[in-house]
A protein has these predicted regions:
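Acidic/His- and Gly-rich active-site-bordering loop/insert found
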Residues: 2-107
C-alpha cells in the first residue's frame, strides 16, 4: 500500500499536472473531484460550488482554535501550451533531474 499522498508531494504534483485544465475552456471538474477525494479521504470537510458544472470551485474547511481564520486560495486551470516548445510533454508530469516538469508546476 502506498504512503499517504501528503507524504508524497512530488506524486501529488505529477497527478495534478496530468489533468489538462487549459482555460479556455477550463474543464477543471475532474481535477477538482480528484482533490476533493484526497481531502475527503484525509477527513477534511469539503463543499463544491459551481455556476458551470465543468468549472466547480472546491471549499475545504479545517476546524480551528481561537486564532483568526486563515484563507488559502488556489487554482487548477492553466494557460494554453499552443506554439510552445517543451522539453517534456506539458501534461506528462515527467520527472527528470530531480524536478517535476509540466504546465502549472510552478504557479500554484
Amino acid at each position: 500500500m502506498p504512503a499517504p499522498i501528503h507524504e508524497r508531494p512530488a506524486d501529488l504534483l505529477t497527478e495534478l499536472i496530468r489533468f489538462e485544465t487549459v482555460n479556455p475552456p477550463g474543464n477543471e471538474r475532474a481535477c477538482v473531484e480528484y482533490v476533493d477525494g484526497l481531502l475527503t479521504e484525509a477527513g477534511i470537510a469539503t463543499e463544491t460550488l459551481a455556476a458551470d458544472p465543468e468549472r466547480p470551485n472546491l471549499l475545504a474547511r479545517l476546524p480551528g482554535g481561537d486564532a483568526p481564520p486563515l484563507l488559502l486560495q488556489g487554482h487548477v486551470d492553466v494557460v494554453p501550451t499552443d506554439g510552445q516548445e517543451w522539453d517534456e510533454p506539458p501534461f506528462s508530469g515527467a520527472r527528470r533531474d530531480g524536478f517535476v516538469w509540466g504546465r502549472g508546476a510552478l504557479d500554484m
